[in-house]
C-alpha cells in the first residue's frame, strides 16, 4: 500500500524469474506489478469545486483484509475481500469514525485497530466479521507532546508509543486490555525512528543526533550492545535515520537508512580499534577523579550502501525480499504551489 498526498494505492507485487543462488544482479520480472485499487475522499469547497482531501495516515492489516485511512474530516475503515481476479471493498462504520487520526495500526493477528486521534490518547477497536466495537480508550499521561510513533510488536504483545519530546512508552496486552508496561529513559534529543526485533524483542531507537540505543523489552533495560552502538562513527552523514529494519534470517543484523544511504550493522562483527583508546577513571571523591588505565575501544563495523538520492522507505517483505521506495526530486517540485508574486517599488 502506497500513501500519496491525497489518495491511497493498493498494489500486488510482481514475481521475478528464477535465478541461481550466486546471482548478484537485477532480476527480470516474470509478472508485472498490478494496481488493485485507489482510495480517496472527495470534498466540495466554498466555491463548489470538488477536490481530494489530504491523507493524514493509513494502515493495512497483516492479513490484507482491513484498510484504514484518515483525513481532516474523520477516519474511514474498509473490509477487503479478494477472490481470484475479483476484488470487493466494503465500507465499515465504527464509533469514533468522525474523529481524525494522526496515526493508526492493526495488531499482529488483525483482530484490533488502534488509532491515535488528534486530541491525544488511543482508541482500541475490536474487529469482527462485519462489526467494529470500541474496546478501550487509553489516556497516556507519560506522553507530553504529539505522538509520532505507534507500532505493534510482531508477537502482538507490546504496543510502542513515542512523541516528539523523546518520550517512549510501552504497553502490553493483558486480559484483552492494554496496560502500561514500561517507559524508556528520556533522551535530550527527539527520536527519528524505532523498530522492535521480531524474535529477540530488542527495541532499537535512533535519535536526531545519530545516537542509537538497543533496549531489551523483556528485561526492561538497555542491552550491553548499546554501549557499542554509542561509538558508531558515521562519516559524511548529514541526514537523520528514517527507519530501522532487521534481517529475518540473521538475528544479529540491523539495517537502517537515511535520505541517501543504507547502513548495515552486524552485531557479531564488532572489532577492537587499537588506535583509539578510552581512559577509565576511578572516582576517589565526589569532586576528584584520577586517571586509570587506557583500554582499546570496541567498535561496530558499519557497511554503507550509497546509491539513492531520496530514499523514503526501506523494509523486508519476506524471507528473501525487501522493498525500497525512492522519490524523484523533480516530482517534489511539481507538487509545490506557484511562487508568490509580490510587487515592490513598481517591479514585480
Q: What are these regions, as identified by a protein language model?
A:
Residues 1-348:
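Long, low-complexity intrinsically disordered regions enriched in Ser/Thr/Pro/Gly
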